Amino acid sequence: MVDRITPATTDTIRVSSADPMAVPTEAFREWVLEDNFAAPRPNWPDVQFVQDVRPHELRKLRILNGAHSFLAYAGLAQGYSYVHEAIADPYLRRRTKQLMMEAGATLPSDMRDQVPDYANALLARFGNVELAHRLDQIAMAGSQKLPYRFLETLRAGRGPIVAEAVRSWMEFCRVQTDQGRALNDPKALDIARAVRSKNPKIALLEVIGGADLAALILG
């Protein structure tokens, strides 16, 4: 499991760097590997070796990635362009923290004590102006991301803010479709058809495999 926020590169970075493959990134980095080597364990002092990497993957998917997606859809709806702008909004910051705590409650029990500190650290990381992490980049391919970032969380435990995040994606899809903007999503055509259907919310849930959660998400 690798955790390091890395926005898409820009023309400015390409021009200013001698490295043609340069990308922006943050100072923070976390690398977790399962201690399951055929040969002796490598001497990598910055790597965390664990028996099971899955809980760390869940923490990243449900808390970091989930919060990013929520900020993307809710932030774009408020007119923001970047993560640092959206997280500076008091309402979105509060809801994002609530989402993190909801998601954290669904993690394996031995990970839950870490959630408050992890969430607070993420809020600080999201406020990094220098990253200039675009919300529309995070919003791409929502049909592929939501099942892991939100739906699995909801199946693991009730979460009203996580459900709100799914509704934010639905509204994003509706607005983009109504305004004639092409969605950057491998299921863009299915999403557009769902938005124009007689029951768009249920149809959108069907696109992402979440129809079983309709009562929880839609209320």
Model-predicted regions and their roles:
Residues M1-G219:
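Substrate/ligand-engaging "lid" and interaction regions
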